[in-house]
């Protein structure tokens, strides 16, 4: 990739995907904000470990190992926003690739269904400045719709 293409790719807007799920916003929020569930619905997540035993709140951190391309990369994510049952936000705080995620949940059909929208962007640091445009964004563009379908399938099959 030519350097001008890297700069152009780095300025691309965040990715946004929505999906409708036949579960209440409270059910969706409870599941999606529990870090232990990440490997169940996010394809690239290899493992998750919470830092501390306190209940999940804004400021809570988790160590997440993801498969990016052919390698596994560890990073720490911090929950920056937690507004049950309507929104949450997470940001990567270390590692070469730092994801920034914002999720919103809208009630549908008198709250019996939900529309989940996830907005995702990345910051590259060090080698991550190359990884983000060359590998990470492409992988995420393919994975985000699959992850949302996985989330829908898990929740509609009765996952708690």
Regions found by a protein language model. Give the residues of each.
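Hydrophobic ligand-binding cavity/cleft-lining segments
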Residues: 2-52, 57, 150, 157-159
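A short, structured loop/turn motif at beta-sheet edges
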Residues: 25-26, 53-56, 81-85, 104-115
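Short, cysteine-centered beta-strand-loop-beta hairpins and adjacent loop/turn segments enriched
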Residues: 68-73, 124-127
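Beta-strand/loop substructures that line and gate deep hydrophobic ligand-binding cavities in soluble
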Residues: 89-146
């Amino acid at each position: 990739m030519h350097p001008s293409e890297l700069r152009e790719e780095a300025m691309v807007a965040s990715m946004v995907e929505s999906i409708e799920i036949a579960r209440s916003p409270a059910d969706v929020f409870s599941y999606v904000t529990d870090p232990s569930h990440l490997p169940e619905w996010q394809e690239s997540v290899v493992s998750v470990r919470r830092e501390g035993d306190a209940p999940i709140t804004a400021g809570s951190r988790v160590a997440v190992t993801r498969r990016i391309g052919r390698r596994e990369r560890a990073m720490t994510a911090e929950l920056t926003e937690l507004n049950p049952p309507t929104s949450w936000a997470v940001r990567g705080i270390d590692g070469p690739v730092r994801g920034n995620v914002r999720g919103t949940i809208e009630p549908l059909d008198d709250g019996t269904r939900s529309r989940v929208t996830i907005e995702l962007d990345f910051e590259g640091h060090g080698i991550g400045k190359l990884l983000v445009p060359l590998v990470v964004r492409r992988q995420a563009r393919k994975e985000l719709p699959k992850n949302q379908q996985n989330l829908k399938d898990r929740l509609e099959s009765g996952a708690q």
